[in-house]
Amino acid sequence: MIINLIFAARKWHNFNINPLYLTYVQTNIMQTSLFHYCGSEWKKHTVSQLAENTNAQLVLCFGGKEVLQKPGIYAVVKEQFPAAEITMCSTAGEIYQDAVQENSLVAVALQFEKTTINTASVNIADHQNSYDAALALAGKLPNKGLKYVMVFSDGRLVNGSELVKGLNLVTGKDVLVTGGLAGDGADFKSTLVGLNEQPAPGKIVAAGFYGDAITITHGSQGGWDIFGLEKEITRSESNVLFEIENQNALELYKKYLGPEAANLPASALLFPLYVTIPGAAKPVVRTILSIDEERKSMTFAGDVP
């Protein structure tokens, strides 16, 4: 596998969740509202037709870890949306309207006229690996009429590549799957995810959208500038990188970072790797989840085979 030590320099803030576009036919009304919770106060911004708090089917919550750790934060959200399925996911920055927020909570409330939604969750601790956890998670969603699966996962304990493989195997090629891994700001310690409960580490949640009255498309865009020479990975295991061209990967990474190496692991957010996977249509950016000084290894959000 060929990589650029990206040392892709960061142009934009790096978020874990790709943009998603829910397109509905004219006979299926979709109502969407955006909420911001900060300092014990709620603010509302209507995205399309107003989604009523009491009738919202699904509420997607993204927040700073400090906010999601507060006892009773789930109860605060549930009080606002009593009938909704509620997902919660920690971030490295929350987007509200056109601005990036930190240490707050942003909630997206969705309400459909004809589309039904089912949800499911698993704990990675109950499964041998991320692939098995994905199989179990997808198996909890009814298959009949399934159109789309939105997934949010622990970002420290889960291998994103294996998660996607398992989900796609169960759902099949005709069902779109998008989502992302939870963030932890610049701390690299633990992430929080929850479904209809106080969020906790190790959780993976999914929301399935059903019926022919909805069409889903998706897109993503990166903002990285690539620099550094192309090099070949010579030793790795799944999403753990050990050697690049027979050199210790962590030491080589630190060499490229220069003074920024002193700020690891936080500075790793600014310098992911640009990876060319054999047989893949195009290269991917791999975000670093952690570094291990004893093993001299680096763990990424997805495979670096």
Language-model features, listed with the residues they occupy:
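Acidic, Ala/Val/Gly-enriched low-complexity intrinsically disordered segments
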Residues: 8-9, 25
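Hydrophobic alpha-helical elements and their junctions with loops/disorder across both membrane
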Residues: 15-16, 141
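Residue-level recognition of conserved structural "scaffold" positions that shape functional pockets
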Residues: 17-19, 186
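Small-residue-enriched flexible segments
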Residues: 28-80, 84-85, 89-305
